[in-house]
Amino acid sequence: MICGIDEVGRGCIFGPILSAAVVFKKKPNFIKELDDSKKLTKEKREYLSSLILENSYYAFGEISNITIEKINIHNASLLAMQTAYENLKLNCNLVFIDGKFVPKISAKNVKAIIKGDSIIDEIKAASIIAKVKRDKLMDEYDKIYPLYLLKKNKGYPTKEHKNAIKKYGVLSLHRKNFKLI
């Protein structure tokens, strides 16, 4: 069994960092359509996400902005990946991680792959479902905090988002140790 893990939200100034772990039940017929989530349109990501969820074992790991502030974004990213793998509750022979650092994972063989979200199909799939899940979370927060344009910026430090912080203040879900806040 091969597992791919990726995270999303590392560069955000609002909300959690979210990670996904994916193991395909069998090689899916849509495998050639997979790519790094950042290279796909929103519509394509959502379409592929539903296919991935139907055809794989998957789990998520979510680390709050408060924990990010306590342990830093690097450690929070590793913890999110570790949590996603633990939540998967499978013993995988091989786990591919997007990036250059390996979280504490109890699998036999764990490999960090730089740009893995463009190379390894399981990481591509994890990238897609993590991005779709976090984007939907930001859409929900946008309903609560519409002045911060979270539906548009997804928690990233856009000019509009930074201007909203200056005008309306920092929210409890902002990452306060981020340099821009």
UniProtKB/Swiss-Prot annotation:
Annotated GO CC locations: cytoplasm; ribonuclease H2 complex
PROSITE patterns, sorted: RNASE_H_2 (PS51975)
Classification via SUPFAM superfamilies: Ribonuclease H-like
Principal location listed in the UniProt entry: cytoplasm
Cofactor: record remark: Manganese or magnesium. Binds 1 divalent metal ion per monomer in the absence of substrate. May bind a second metal ion after substrate binding.
Known catalytic reactions: Endonucleolytic cleavage to 5'-phosphomonoester
Cellular compartment(s): Cytoplasm
Domain of life of the source: Bacteria
Residues holding a divalent metal cation: 6-7, 98
EC number of the protein: 3.1.26.4
RNase H type-2 domain location: 1-181
Job of this protein: Endonuclease that specifically degrades the RNA of RNA-DNA hybrids.
Protein name, as recorded: Ribonuclease HII
Gene: rnhB
